[in-house]
């Protein structure tokens, strides 16, 4: 079968999912004719993606999260205003996607959570089906329950997510753990789509690659570089704790060495994974993909959401486990409930270290769930 991918270029997660999906399809005799990637002035397409993806990559202007003045969290007001004011500028992108789909004539379109991809698909009047893929679709599931307060932004998020899924033949919702499907909403719950380089670090027989160890340092990733101030302030008081953080500062050197125990790295996927495998604990802005990588390797997690979508991820990775297990005071009938992560509004590394040493309970079923991905995804792309 012949596929075209449409990929949201914001952050790292959707890009690595596209890499994994292309590899899976090619290994099973399918063709990926093109990868259409949404770009924005604030982000540069990571070199690891351009280097790894085999299909031709074509770019189009797409929606963008606009950070606050401190470049820490996404500003809902600024993001909304920016994208509304630039809406006319997105019309050429919709036309571009529509035209390319007509030219390429794929058997299947895979949309990695890009709203302009959905609109371009609809305007193309293509008869081929569109599959939507992303963890955000799990928030539409009938069994996904939000808390009664503090998450009002999920209404706008779910409205947007419903728009992305408009006209999809099937919706594949990436999840930390198995859940029943939601046929009414065309939602199939599927494992995270991790790359072979990640899966090979923890084998099916339970043994680990020698690279997986506790190297004593804290590893981290911040989508918005403004969080680096949190890290610098903590480091000034705890200079004995090694820190290795990745950020999106393309204007800095590939590795910015602050001193012997603190370095900032521009995003490089091979180096990122190497540092993940060897860390004591991991701190992140709660993006789905790297959280799954840490959970797969059994690393304690600090999740620092920078916008409502990541806040929902953090909720799912913490309280979601308690709800699923019907736990009371953190205990279920046949043992401890997994507690892979803790959340904070800042990069509170004291909290992470305390959690790692005293409260962390790995989700030991997660690696098995993640290893099911290839067979599940091949099945879902065959039976449309």
Describe the residue ranges of each PLM region.
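Leloir-type glycosyltransferase catalytic cores
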Residues: 163-170, 177, 321-384
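Conserved nucleotide-sugar donor-binding subdomain of glycosyltransferases
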Residues: 72-108, 115-116
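Glycosyltransferases and closely related glycan-assembly transferases
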Residues: 49-52, 95-108, 118-131
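A donor-sugar binding/catalytic signature common to diverse glycosyltransferases
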Residues: 109-112, 274-313
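Active-site-proximal region of nucleotide-activated glycan assembly enzymes
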Residues: 129-189
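Donor-nucleotide binding loops and adjacent catalytic segments primarily
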Residues: 195, 202-278
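Conserved nucleotide-sugar phosphate-binding/catalytic loop shared by glycosyltransferases and other
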Residues: 9, 27-28, 32-86
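A short, glycine/small-residue-rich beta-strand->loop->alpha-helix junction that serves as a flexible
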Residues: 7-19
